[in-house]
């Protein structure tokens, strides 16, 4: 897609200058100072064929948010040269009084420590943003997102930039497996066994399109994996935080879209359903869901004894992370002799968990087997927190793709959810691939998804008739080492 040659970001003369801004002290991180000009020197960002998008515009955004909402802007020497696990990094703490902020308000910003722009090529800068959100219990909470800036910025005819929020399938109940840290190592590793390249390679490909790319830690600081409301809120509020930065600077408007595959669709689908009531004014103009998961607990039988059986444990611990009564019940039903092994998923990284529990009978960890998981106390929680397809009708256009022979997440529930959304008036293109399975559809669906996203970002998409288009397709991309999503 051709790049717009005029991409220099213009600052409004009414915005505060750097010299007008102050940096607040933070009792957790120590005293910051006003030398932000030196501490946040950013690389130049090429724009289009001849223009240069000046990072000063983004620097103004980082500083302006401090004055507007009390965010704590940190110098590079306050954070670490190399990233620390979130549970050990004092930056991953909300400042006092964050509960009084509004969802999407920025609480902290820093340049991502270490070599993230080297790990993720095609990125000119990367930021960690800590923002106010809402947890699964509808209580004030916070989360972190990682924002990548491309080397060349695409602008739509309206002059808006394109922001793609990609929700990774984090599949972990360990806070230290959050994407903001995982991007440095486990998400930067290829998976030769499955013939898949790293997530960071895929992010680099997205950046090459000229899009801003957002990767939220949608499960939050408690790693509430599988809690759809938590993930949906965090996805929405990460976008709100970025749009808030842009609106403060007057630098650029944003056309935002959301995308997730497999476990990432839980956050993406929840955000789409929550948007009409939780954030009706947010500008999310499109959503893509591949290999869609509609009911986390409904897939336990197919996951049990599979290579990814650990996902069952991560889900049970993640969904109950913010619900003490349900967590207490869950732990009370574990076989004492293997309880510690089950609970170790809270502390080991997701890859080690997958290897350790591959092929295992997870139901055997419970005193009464699967019956303990089917108890009303857990099923009621799953019904309230771990399903999509039962909320509001998503208001944005959607592209949904899935392999008919998906062996990990059967297609039947997806068909039902799509039909419900269609009956409610949603604008959906749903493609059911006649070839491949869950893993193959990662690559088979990617070109179609990107092509559809371009129609959203270049503002050429228009509602079609009928509003829902459901079709079987036969798409097989040649086997190669490809980006894992």
Curated annotation (Swiss-Prot):
EC number(s) per entry: 3.1.1.-
Gene Ontology terms for molecular function: triacylglycerol lipase activity
Coiled-coil blocks: none
SUPFAM superfamilies with a match to the protein in the record: alpha/beta-Hydrolases
Pathway stated in the Swiss-Prot or TrEMBL entry: Mycotoxin biosynthesis
InterPro entries registered for this protein in UniProt: AB_hydrolase_fold (IPR029058), Lipase_secreted (IPR005152)
Transmembrane segments: none
PANTHER family tied to this protein: LIP-DOMAIN-CONTAINING PROTEIN-RELATED, PTHR34853
Active-site residues annotated for this sequence: 262 (charge relay system), 406 (charge relay system), 438 (charge relay system)
Organism for this UniProt entry: Stachybotrys chartarum (strain CBS 109288 / IBT 7711) (Toxic black mold)
Comp. bias regions, Low complexity: 9-23
Gene Ontology biological-process annotations: lipid catabolic process
Function recorded in the entry: Probable trichothecene esterase; part of the satratoxin SC1 cluster involved in the biosynthesis of satratoxins, trichothecene mycotoxins that are associated with human food poisonings. Satratoxins are suggested to be made by products of multiple gene clusters (SC1, SC2 and SC3) that encode 21 proteins in all, including polyketide synthases, acetyltransferases, and other enzymes expected to modify the trichothecene skeleton. SC1 encodes 10 proteins, SAT1 to SAT10.
Family recorded in the similarity comment: Belongs to the AB hydrolase superfamily. Lipase family.
Region spans: Disordered: 1-23
Other comment: Trichothecenes are sesquiterpenoid toxins that act by inhibiting protein biosynthesis.
Protein name: Probable trichothecene esterase SAT6
Sorted UniProt keywords: Hydrolase
